[in-house]
Amino acid sequence: MASVDELQKKIKELEAKLAAVEAKGGPMRQKIEVMSSEVVDSNPYSRLMALKRMGIVNNYEQIREKTVAVVGVGGVGSVTAEMLTRCGIGKLILFDYDKVELANMNRLFFQPHQAGLSKVDAAAATLQNINPDVTIDAYNYNITTVDNFQKFCDTISKGSLTGGAVDLVLSCVDNFEARMAINTACNELDQKWFESGVSENAVSGHIQFISPGESACFACAPPLVVATKVDERTLKREGVCAASLPTTMGIVAGFLVQNSLKYLLEFGNVTHYLGYSALTDFFPTMSLQPNPTCDDASCRARQEQRRLQPRVELAAEVTEDCGPVHQDNDWGISVLEENSPADEDCPGLKLVDGVQVAYSIPVDSSTPESSTGGAVAASELSLEDLMQQMKTM
């Protein structure tokens, strides 16, 4: 028989679910079968489709064919899932085993009436109301356990809309154990993924794109806690928690989704590593090469596979010099050769090949040579006589 505490806990969960149902309010909009660029108030995709009209994205409709797995539906993960949902992603798979608490309310997305619900269920209900066109699967379990790890691998390898592997995995977890589990799974499955994180003091964060065998995985250069194999749970103290700013988490989530869209829709450049320091507004970027002696055997195997693949050399695009667009004009403007700056614009300046001046260098008119065109004429006067003449001027 259940204890009083268990029954009270169950009552709270049922009350939370009832509050969530009541909060849904009016009916959801009807599903939209085809994305349209028509600019009307009732079209939620018109501004997204404008990216296609402006030449940023070739085919935005492809996003409805994509499947993304979000692991961790906390401060970063919930906002990431919301952004992807609003962008019209085809399918979203959510993983988390935690429950919504009132302490989560500073992290955006979740609402007080959802306290007590599992994060994935609360997120799925809210996201489905935002965009009913998105297929959402929610998995409420810890991926780091042996049994659940295999379930996780099966889901990301067969959970797409077509029954194959997902297009991208986004790690939004807050511990190294879960990151290592995602890293292991993606290395084994040759699955591309993004790792993200926010510092404990909430004023810095990062995202990292990981392509097994091509870029450094999470085990190639692990944090000290991972490298020394310390149990993270022993580092946590009662009554002490990490700081959390919704601004920092929103920024990191924005970077994460922005680069995910660039990868999925093939536009722009995907950043391999992007950091963020809120105190100095510093955004470092870099590329990380895989470690040949990585502890992860699957990572080393993927590196060997990439090494044996024939390199594809891209032919250089040859463009024809068409000259100035408007050679003749009504304003008397003439165009000089870009690689031949006029000599009079930069007297005495020697430029190496490929270097141009951005402006003309002014001649110093204060020197006698510049004003008279030669040296000052010799004078028989002494220094005292010259000073006396200057005083009388």
Curated annotation (Swiss-Prot):
Molecular functions (GO terms): ATP binding; metal ion binding; UFM1 activating enzyme activity
Chain positions recorded as Zn(2+) binding sites: 217, 220, 294, 299
Catalytic residues (UniProt): 241
Signal peptide per UniProt: none
InterPro entries in the cross-refs: D-isomer_DH_CS1, ThiF/MoeB/HesA, ThiF_NAD_FAD-bd, Ubiquitin-activating_enz
Any one cellular-component term (Gene Ontology): cytosol
Example of a GO biological process term: protein ufmylation
Residues that bind ATP: 75, 96, 119, 142, 175
Superkingdom: Eukaryota
Alphabetized UniProt keyword annotations: ATP-binding, Metal-binding, Nucleotide-binding, Ubl conjugation pathway, Zinc
Role played: E1-like enzyme which activates UFM1.
Family named by the database record: Belongs to the ubiquitin-activating E1 family. UBA5 subfamily.
Protein name per Swiss-Prot or TrEMBL: Ubiquitin-like modifier-activating enzyme 5
Organism of provenance: Bombyx mori
